[in-house]
Swiss-Prot record:
GO biological process, alphabetically ordered: valyl-tRNA aminoacylation
Gene: valS
Compartments where found: Cytoplasm
Assembly behavior: Monomer.
Chain positions of motif 'KMSKS' region: 526-530
Catalytic activities: tRNA(Val) + L-valine + ATP = L-valyl-tRNA(Val) + AMP + diphosphate
EC number: 6.1.1.9
Family as reported in the entry's similarity comment: Belongs to the class-I aminoacyl-tRNA synthetase family. ValS type 1 subfamily.
Pfam families associated with the record: Anticodon_1, tRNA-synt_1, Val_tRNA-synt_C
Protein name: Valine--tRNA ligase
Residue runs in coiled coils: 810-881
Species name: Bacillus cereus (strain ZK / E33L)
Length: 881
């Protein structure tokens, strides 16, 4: 990067800093994996975002963490591959494209499958471009030369091969099962596509008459329309109330069908009446009961949610219209005895908003138990297992894997991987293969596509060239090193990648899984359209820059925890960057055209020089160690404290003494240390704030083209000086204590005061005498006395630090009479406040009636006033000494 400016611009402007840098990085190919055999590979595949629109804050957080990892590893000398890509997102994208078509007054059926897919691909190209632009705005170091899409030809080949092999192993089968059905989009849904909402419904209590006329049996349901498909009534085998009825039959009201009373342990004796209706075609639990008792399955609804011919006179009605009509008929027949209001959780389609129907359907399934067993067994092998960070999520994962159900993988959509199965037009024979049958004219391909998660489960290896196991990238970069993702998709994605990786590559797809939480608003609420509390990361970047947003996102929570987003805290980070900018300007203005090779740390160093280099070593160690543990928050806080407190507030101020002095050797050493420390700090900070660190680094004396490929800092033992660090800590404690005393008595630093220091021994005396120039510079004493045998003067403010006592005579600091009068007035005020609040708290009526929070607030006030009153009393006592 050409750099003609000697100094940074006066003001930090994130927009001008970030403009053009990303394109410069791409042109330099700094993010492309090199395949250099001398370097150890490090691989992350990006969790592919859906090509459905804009990226949200969760994506920005997730990808920022990955960028921090890959930038750090690249600087540490690894051959880094961070592979980008996007997911076709079957139902989500199809819903968006269909919505766009509806605006034009046409449906997908008007277009036909091929034309509709052309529209979907047009959508994909448009939104993939938007996503790449957003990745660039965030500053993500992705290797675009290897970008993948789940419907790419190579990935589609992998999907077909996996389907066929699982089918041939008997692990994929076709059968009837209860699935989540969306009547609006007419497709099966995965569990993650079902949003559960609390809805006001009702329990409908009904009497089913015993067929022999000897009475009735009472039960309740929240979905009365499904009773039209009832094929049994069940009770618990140990329920004494109903034992005598087991084996008898009831007559289904309205329908008139005779159905058996069966015994099954699924029934809870203590819930409701202890009797449940069994509808095998419309409830997953009833389906299982039906299988155990060989009950018929009567489907009473069509795919669009209307009632079918099995529903009798309700045929053609919408399911909810049917509910109203049926309830009315049941009331008139005297069967419905009570409607009890009931709040309950009802599944809704994430895409259409329709109430999801448990629905009997012929679908394709993956037999999960054999695959899950291998994945669970892997976790017993310490060297081969997948490591979860935080560790507690391993138990979450294992519990789910040990209680897994077969996976419905077919979807009634057009956008996606079409199932590689064909049915013979005459014989009905099923053919499954990676290629179509030779006599294709005699076969019809299955119309369904695969669940999006099926292809996503292959993402870590299909993107690297599998099923060609000789592919260069697959051989070099698989298995991957880390996966960064949210805890909400451990079941739907992480687990499936693990068992598919084991089944088809024989090893774990990634070594570590770093789990983060969800982004919430400042009140801890999940961000949603309904609450209107969503925040566009591009707007945050526009206002405060990518660096500020990234630093907040990466340091705002611990692994596995949710993140409360705060625009105020992003602004605070912007202020931090502004401080870095101003400190960097100071350093650069004092470089005196220094070249990189002129940086010399061998000269004689002051205590401040030795201290800042020791603190830099400690910061390098802390940041590196915490990065290795995925503790980005801890790493970021180490950097923040070092930059803000040690470097900006202390060292730069202390560096002004030699810089503005006459000693040329001291000036040169100070310039070298300023340049070195700022260079090393920018490298440590670079993964968090790539833009501003590159900009500053380019202005510093440096070696190499870009900070993105500069070497990661390492601890230098030759620059470690713990004794000097201890000396500096004493100086800092003294200076802080003096500043605190001055603040306490409202005496400005510009006013000179006497200062006496009693050193505890000769060693401390020697230290303080040697470094007295710092005390004089930062404490502004009219006279400084340092001795080991000082007596405490009368009427002086004192402070005790490790190794010394400080005395500042009050007469120098304040007018004693005026201060005494002021403190007496303060004491009187606090006496009244204590009396008022104690009177309130002793009032039994107040304590009995006031909310707990109000009482707690008053008690806190009492404690605060008591402490302040005691401090004033102590100050008055000091005046009288």
């Amino acid at each position: 990067m050409s750099n003609t400016e000697k100094n940074l611009p006066t003001k930090y402007d994130h927009m001008s800093v970030e403009e053009g840098l990303y394109q410069w990085w791409l042109e330099g190919k700094y993010f492309e994996a090199t395949g250099d055999e001398k370097k150890q590979p490090y691989t992350i595949v990006i969790p592919p975002p859906n090509v459905t629109g804009k990226l949200h804050l969760g994506h920005a957080w997730d990808t920022t963490l990955q960028d921090i990892l890959t930038r750090t590893k690249r600087m540490q000398g690894y051959d880094v591959l961070w592979l980008p890509g996007m997911d076709h997102a079957g139902i989500a994208t199809q819903a968006k494209v269909e919505g766009k078509l509806r605006e034009e007054g046409i449906s997908r059926y008007d277009l036909g499958r091929e034309k509709f897919l052309e529209k979907a691909w047009e959508w994909k190209e448009e939104y993939a471009s938007h996503i790449r632009q957003q990745w660039g705005k965030v500053g993500l170091g992705l290797d675009y030369s290897r970008e993948r899409f789940t419907l790419d030809e190579g990935l589609s080949d992998a999907v077909n091969k996996v389907f066929v092999q699982l089918y041939e192993k008997g692990l994929i089968y076709r059968g009837e099962y209860i699935i989540n059905w969306d009547p609006a989009t007419r497709t099966a849904l995965s569990d993650i596509e079902v949003i559960h909402k609390e809805v006001q419904g009702a329990f409908y209590h009904m009497n089913y008459p015993l067929t022999d006329g000897s009475g009735h049996i009472r039960l309740a349901t929240t979905r009365p329309e499904t009773m039209l498909g009832d094929t049994a009534v069940a009770v618990h085998p140990e329920d004494d109330r109903y034992k005598h009825l087991i084996g008898k039959t009831v007559t289904l009201p309205i329908v008139g069908r005779e159905i058996p009373i069966i015994a099954d342990e699924y029934v809870e004796k203590d819930f409701g009446t202890g009797v449940v209706k069994i509808t095998p075609a419309h409830d997953p639990n009833d389906f299982e009961v039906g299988n155990r008792h060989d009950l018929p399955r009567i489907l009473v609804m069509n795919e669009d949610g209307s009632m079918n011919e099995k529903a009798g006179k309700y045929n053609g009605m919408d399911r909810f219209e049917c509910r109203k009509a049926l309830v009315k008929d049941l009331q008139e027949a005297g069967v419905l005895v009570e409607i009890e209001p009931h709040m309950h959780s009802v599944g809704h389609s994430e895409r259409s908003g329709a109430v999801v129907e448990p629905y009997l359907s012929t679908q394709w399934f993956v037999k999960m138990a054999p695959l899950a067993e291998k994945a669970v067994a892997l976790q017993q092998k310490d060297e081969e297992k997948v490591t979860f960070v935080p560790e507690r999520f391993e138990n979450t994962y294992l519990r789910w894997m040990e209680n897994i159900h077969d996976w419905c993988i077919s979807r009634q959509l057009w956008w996606g991987h079409r199932i590689p199965a064909w049915y013979h037009k005459e014989t009905g024979e099923v053919y499954v293969g990676t290629e179509a049958p030779a006599d294709i004219e005699n076969w019809n391909q299955d119309n369904d596509v695969l669940d999006t998660w099926f292809s996503s489960a292959l993402w870590p290896f299909s993107t690297l060239g599998w099923p060609n196991e000789d592919a260069a990238d697959f051989k070099r970069y698989y298995s991957t090193d880390a996966l960064v993702t949210g805890y909400d998709i451990i079941f739907f994605w992480v687990s499936r990648m693990i068992f598919q990786g084991l089944e088809f590559t024989g090893e774990r797809p990634f070594k570590d899984v770093l789990i983060h939480g969800l982004v919430r608003d400042e009140q801890g609420r999940k961000m949603s359209k309904s609450l209107g509390n969503g925040i566009d990361p591009m707007e945050v970047i526009e206002k405060y820059g990518a660096d500020a947003m990234r630093f907040f996102l990466s340091t705002g929570s611990a692994p596995g925890q949710d993140l409360r987003f705060s625009m105020e805290k992003v602004e605070s980070t912007w202020n931090f960057i502004n401080k870095i900018w101003n400190a960097s300007r100071f350093v650069l203005m004092n470089m005196d055209d220094m070249k990189y090779e002129e940086i010399d740390l061998t000269g004689e160093k002051s205590v401040a020089d030795k201290w800042i280099l020791t603190r830099l070593n400690e910061t390098i160690e802390s940041v590196t160690r915490n990065m290795d543990k995925y503790e980005f928050g801890e790493a970021g806080r180490s950097l923040y404290n070092f930059i803000w407190d040690d470097f900006c507030d202390w060292y730069i101020e202390m560096a002004k003494l030699p810089l503005y002095g006459e000693d040329e050797a001291a000036k040169k050493t100070t310039r070298s240390i300023l340049a070195y420390v700022l260079d090393q700090t920018m490298r440590l900070l670079h993964p968090f704030m790539p833009f501003v660190t590159e900009k500053i680094w380019q202005h510093l004396p440096h070696e190499g083209e870009s900070i993105t490929v500069a070497a990661w800092p390492t601890v230098r033992e030759d620059l470690q000086d713990t004794e000097a660090a201890a000396e500096m800590h004493l100086l800092v404690d003294i200076i802080r204590s003096v500043r605190n005393i001055r603040a306490e008595v409202n005496t400005p630093m510009s006013k000179k005061v006497q200062m006496q220091i009693k050193a505890k021994d000769e060693a401390v005396l020697a230290q303080l005498t040697k470094n007295s120039s710092y005390i004089e510079r930062f404490c502004n004493p009219s006279e400084l006395t340092i001795q080991t045998d000082l007596q405490a003067p009368e009427k002086a403010m004192t402070a005790i630090v490790t190794g010394a006592e400080l005395f500042l005579p009050l007469a120098d600091l304040i007018n004693l009479d005026e201060e005494r009068a002021r403190l007496e007035k303060e004491l009187e005020k606090f006496d009244k406040e204590v009396e008022r609040v104690q009177k309130k708290l002793s009032n039994q009526g107040f304590v009995a009636k006031a909310p707990a929070a109000v009482i707690e607030g008053e008690r806190a006030k009492e404690q605060d006033y008591l402490e302040k009153r005691e401090a004033v009393r102590q100050r008055l006592a000091d005046l009288e000494k």
